[in-house]
Amino acid sequence: MSTSFMKSPRLFFTSESVTEGHPDKICDQVSDAVLDAFLSHDPRARVACETATTTGLIVVIGEVTYEQGYIPIEEIVRKTIKDIGYTDAAYGFDADTCGVMVAIHGQSPDIAQGVNRALEVRSDGQVTEEEVATIGAGDQGMMFGFACNETPELMPLPIALAHRIGRRLSRLRKDGVLPYLRPDGKSQVTIEYSYGRPVRVDTVLVSNQHAPDVTQEQIRHDIIHHVIHEVIPNDLLDEKTKYFVNPTGRFVIGGPMGDSGLTGRKIIVDTYGGMARHGGGAFSGKDPTKVDRSAAYACRWVAKNVVAAGLADRFEIQVSYAIGVARPLSISVECFGTNKVPEETIVRLIDEHFDLRPGAIIRDLRLRRPIYRPTAAYGHFGRDDIDAPWEQTDRAEALRRAAGL
């Protein structure tokens, strides 16, 4: 999002979310459920787990290094699918009868030698363990974090509302309030902004898989009244707000029967709905030595604390890494003209108050725990309903004092 966003008197921005039964999200959840199982068995396990699904089939592949022991991967896969709600063959996909293929092998020793012991430690005997993290970055790349004061959770409003709709659809389905709903679905929200502030909801789009015997009129009525009006504040809706509910007119065939799915294909849904940049690396199925995940979490932690401290109203941070090297290669920030102190000061304060080496991130955010399965649906950020330590604003007051605010 450029600084022109803050200067425009009228601008529209759209973000989407998907429900937990979307084929790509099935794969994300399976990958993270497998990751959690390995971390429960061995907190230092190295895991890179990818999943694919299509009609009647789940395929789990990847690389794992862990203390030996039995991990019942097929059982984990079936339980995850059942928890999502694919429990009936009439849906075209169900936990009890789908095929499960598993092809997981050991991690490359070439990668492991760099991750196990960072370049700074391996190459210089004079450097002490206290000065550098012992864990090098698991790959090269750049990661972004973002926060803004549009919502209490310091997330962009379009993606926040899209996720709320998705969670509400899931709750009403699982509680039996709208029993004709099935697991697959999508939501999309368009917000009208004026000079960088959200002023109204322009458009809401909801598509949800359903039983064949329900009318489109009933679906539209129920979703508008029991979903949209329950999660979107009334003061954001007006007579010009447009509602699209299952605009194709029918959504009976869905889930893996309708579309194949893959881990890592919903990275914008997982993050900020397109309001911020993305480094390209997906999260699910990756243990915290993979900076695609852990550094992106740390960047969100930094960004949320910067905004909570009042240093800026909108804030984006980029960090970059080299494989096997612990220290970030670069840190850059963008405040979109909303900063209360110079950006150079903010970079200095970040360096003073946050250690962005992978080992330090894992330590400070307690990332070796099996906490990842719940993150794999309805966004990794802005969550207060799951264990997400990167959402804490524990350093905001220290940043505020250090900035003299």
UniProtKB/Swiss-Prot annotation:
Mg(2+) binds at residue 24. Pfam families: S-AdoMet_synt_C, S-AdoMet_synt_M, S-AdoMet_synt_N. Its EC number is 2.5.1.6. The keyword ATP-binding applies. This is S-adenosylmethionine synthase. Gene3D superfamilies: 3.30.300.10. CDD domains: S-AdoMet_synt. K(+) binds at residue 50. It catalyses: L-methionine + ATP + H2O = S-adenosyl-L-methionine + phosphate + diphosphate. InterPro entries: ADOMET_SYNTHASE_CS, S-AdoMet_synt_C, S-AdoMet_synt_central, S-AdoMet_synt_N, S-AdoMet_synthetase, S-AdoMet_synthetase_sfam. ATP binds at residues 22, 184-186, 250-251, 259, 265-266, 282, 286. GO terms for cellular component: cytoplasm. Binds 2 divalent ions per subunit. GO terms for biological process: one-carbon metabolic process; S-adenosylmethionine biosynthetic process. L-methionine binds at residues 63, 107, 259, 290. The gene is metK. Keywords: ATP-binding, Cytoplasm, Magnesium, Metal-binding, Nucleotide-binding, One-carbon metabolism, Potassium, Transferase. Residues 107-117 are annotated as: Flexible loop. Belongs to the AdoMet synthase family. It is found in: Cytoplasm. One of its GO terms (molecular function) is magnesium ion binding. It comes from Roseiflexus castenholzii (strain DSM 13941 / HLO8). HAMAP family: S_AdoMet_synth1.
